[in-house]
């Protein structure tokens, strides 16, 4: 049943990508369309709903801050103002909902991190993928992340433990967008009622996204939980 669901979902995603590129647009035109879609998304007061009409995520109207403001605020985003920091070098927008418990991934470390997420296609205005509920996938997406002198890289676990990102897109390398929060969040496990794991929201352009987004030039919104895997 799961294999059928992922095959069907992969076909839907591929078809959506075909539709987005089927009018012979140039790459420059596609990028311009993506930029306009992101600009509109920031202002639209979006609420993401599921197939049954249930509310999954209230995105709201987004207030963009600079990296300098973000650093001046101790690398935090003000949730009351619904702030997202824009990283100028890669076009990723990030909101830190919770900084998490435990420790950051230190230089020289490789750690296993489990992720639960939703993926929303901004250009297609649709919920595209999720593993935050067991109906879609019982496994979280597990990535082995390495911090090499402050530069993060990662690979998704494959095989029987593969999560929905690898099963859907077939790409072992972790997308840049998912790695962007790691310098600023702690990765641990919840052991008390108050100590909740890290949670972020991201707007990821195609240049930092998964393979289908990169091929078809569309941005995605993510809400992701980061948790340290058990030994």
Regions found by a protein language model. Name each.
Residues 5, 21-231:
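Cross-family detector of peptidyl-prolyl cis-trans isomerase
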């Amino acid at each position: 049943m799961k294999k059928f669901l992922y095959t069907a979902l992969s076909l839907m995603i591929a078809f959506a990508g075909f539709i987005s590129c089927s009018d012979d647009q140039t790459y420059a035109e596609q990028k311009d369309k993506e930029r306009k879609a992101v600009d509109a998304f920031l202002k639209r007061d979006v609420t993401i709903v599921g197939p049954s009409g249930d509310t999954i995520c209230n995105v709201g109207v987004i207030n963009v801050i600079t990296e300098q403001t973000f650093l001046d605020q101790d690398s935090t985003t003000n949730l009351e103002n619904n702030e997202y920091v824009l990283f100028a070098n890669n076009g990723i927008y990030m909101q830190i909902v919770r900084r998490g418990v435990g420790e950051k991934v230190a230089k020289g470390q490789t750690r296993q991190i489990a992720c639960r997420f939703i993926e929303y296609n901004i250009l297609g205005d649709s919920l595209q993928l999720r593993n935050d509920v067991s109906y879609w996938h019982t496994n979280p997406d597990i990535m082995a992340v390495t911090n090499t002198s402050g530069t993060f890289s990662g690979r998704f676990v494959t095989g029987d433990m593969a999560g929905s990102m690898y099963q859907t897109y077939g790409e072992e390398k972790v997308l840049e967008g998912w790695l962007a929060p790691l310098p600023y969040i702690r990765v641990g496990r919840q052991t008390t009622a108050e100590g909740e794991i890290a949670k972020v929201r991201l707007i990821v352009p195609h240049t930092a996204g998964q393979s289908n987004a990169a091929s078809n030039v569309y941005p995605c919104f993510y809400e992701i939980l980061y948790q340290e895997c058990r030994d």
